[in-house]
From Swiss-Prot:
Species of origin: Anaplasma marginale (strain St. Maries)
Lineage of the species this protein comes from: Bacteria, Pseudomonadati, Pseudomonadota, Alphaproteobacteria, Rickettsiales
Keyword Glycosyltransferase recorded: no
Protein task: Transfers the 4'-phosphopantetheine moiety from coenzyme A to a Ser of acyl-carrier-protein.
Binding site for Mg(2+): 8, 60
GO molecular function, one term: holo-[acyl-carrier-protein] synthase activity
Gene Ontology terms describing biological process: fatty acid biosynthetic process
Designated name of the protein: Holo-[acyl-carrier-protein] synthase
Amino acid sequence: MIVGIGVDLVSVRRMQQLLERFGNRFTARAFSEVEIRDSLQYKNAHAVARHFAKRFAAKEAYVKAVGLGFGRGIEMRGVSVFNDALGKPRIAVSGDVGHNIELSLSDDGEYAIAFVVLHV
């Protein structure tokens, strides 16, 4: 049974501006160690921004699906987006969430999008 859905769209250009302006202060607040480590595989700033934009969109889509916001029991670093062994995007959440999470990520040009479905 579906218990929540969420979608979010993030500007890759805006993410790149945030990364240029705030650097490690921003990534340390918003992203998990796994997400930061995974970004190191990219060689240029635009690819890094695309990586973080998709993960940021996934976090926002997740909290929308749950029906809460960040700071209301969910912290940004407590939601970690990674790819499994087959390359499928996954979300790991700190604590027992009591539901299954399906995640789809995409990017095209200057935008990244995430769609989350929660089900039991």
